[in-house]
């Protein structure tokens, strides 16, 4: 059984569209502005500059340029016309895209990623489109284009990372992606991003952070991950360090995306004592607690991760207290958000269960008074009463 704390992320945009627009404007020909998609991630019109790109590794001919323009046009038509999408499958759109994805030209690949991402977001995609895509060679080529290293192209990788995200969220056949090595590829890409996002030379890579975090978070909820050894691949301490590097990066640059990193940390810690051990041995509890004031959503996720650690048993709770945890929880009890307070109550219950001395410290620091303010809240009454009894009888 999966831990109830594990959860899928929603297959929606996450606020990175503005980042994508700025990157594309930096790369575009100044004489031909890029038309940024609007609304949800990637949905909307995009135009090619119609000019050879300076990023090409090989000369382009008219056929390549024509192919790129056709793919962008196709992507825009997919957004605009459901009737048009219905005609694409019988006309062989998936085999055509599978052929195009083998192109050596980066602008063609980026245009292909755009068109494919529009196709995968169609409402009928889970039943009528994604099964055909998974049955083709496209997934293997997508993962190849996401391999970290000097050949990784940010524009191409961003498009295909979002494509992978839409496929994973459909839950059509994630076991197949795992068999193709998706967890390993994404794990290595996570390490690569953590070492690259702060570098001005790799500015485009910051756009990869959100889809990579989401893909990994969602794949970790699949039972096939255990069967293929995916959890073992992600138990490396470097994964934990990389997540925290990215959390600090997001806190400084894009705080609205912090929940993406915390969801991954939540799903990593839910069923992995070794990841929880890494959190403690690397002294990362304090940095986690420092995220509590960011927002209520962030607070709930931080507290959930800490619950994952605490529920592993007495040895883990010995590392949680004494320390700053108790005072931080008393601060959260002063809040009015029932989700934050409820998660704080659960964490305190676990802490008192395995560290009775923490209950005594809680009482000495006016913990009962902090609980009283929530006694009349219907959603919290039972948990408040249970915690009061636990604290008084430890």
Describe the residue ranges of each PLM region.
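Extended acidic/polar regulatory tracts at the flanks of large eukaryotic scaffold/adaptor proteins
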Residues: 2-5, 17, 23-26, 174, ...
């Amino acid at each position: 059984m999966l831990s109830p704390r594990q959860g899928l992320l929603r297959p929606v945009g996450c606020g990175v569209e503005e980042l994508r627009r700025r990157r594309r404007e930096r790369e575009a020909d100044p004489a031909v502005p890029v038309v940024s998609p609007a609304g949800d991630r990637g949905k909307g019109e995009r135009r090619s500059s119609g000019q050879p790109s300076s990023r090409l590794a090989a000369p382009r001919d008219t056929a390549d340029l024509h192919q790129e323009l056709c793919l962008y046009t196709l992507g825009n038509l997919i957004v605009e016309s459901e009737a048009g999408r219905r005609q694409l499958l019988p006309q062989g759109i998936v085999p055509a895209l599978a052929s195009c994805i083998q192109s050596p030209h980066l602008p063609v690949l980026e245009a292909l990623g755009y068109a494919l991402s529009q196709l995968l977001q169609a409402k009928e995609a889970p039943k009528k489109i994604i099964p055909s895509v998974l049955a083709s060679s496209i997934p293997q080529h997508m993962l190849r284009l996401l391999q970290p290293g000097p050949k990784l192209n940010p524009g191409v990788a961003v498009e295909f990372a979002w494509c992978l995200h839409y496929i994973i969220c459909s839950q059509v056949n994630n076991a197949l992606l795992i068999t193709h090595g998706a967890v390993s590829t994404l794990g290595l890409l996570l390490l690569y991003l953590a070492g690259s996002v702060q570098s001005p030379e790799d500015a485009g890579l910051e756009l990869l952070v959100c889809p990579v975090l989401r893909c990994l978070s969602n794949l970790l909820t699949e039972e096939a991950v255990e069967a293929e050894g995916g959890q073992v691949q992600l138990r490396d301490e470097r994964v934990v360090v990389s997540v925290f590097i990215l959390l600090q990066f997001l806190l400084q640059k894009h705080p609205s995306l912090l929940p993406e990193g915390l969801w991954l940390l939540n799903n990593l810690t839910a069923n992995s004592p070794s990841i929880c051990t890494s959190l403690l041995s690397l002294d990362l509890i304090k940095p986690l607690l420092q995220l509590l004031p960011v927002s209520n959503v962030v607070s709930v996720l931080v507290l959930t991760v800490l619950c994952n650690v605490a529920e592993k048993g007495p040895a883990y709770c010995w590392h949680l207290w004494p320390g700053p945890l108790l005072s931080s929880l008393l601060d959260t009890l002063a809040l009015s958000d029932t989700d934050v307070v409820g998660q704080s109550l659960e964490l305190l219950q676990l802490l008192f269960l395995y560290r009775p001395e923490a209950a005594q410290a809680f009482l000495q620091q006016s913990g009962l008074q902090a609980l009283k303010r929530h006694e009349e809240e219907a959603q919290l009454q039972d948990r408040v009463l249970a915690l009061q009894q636990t604290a008084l009888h430890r």
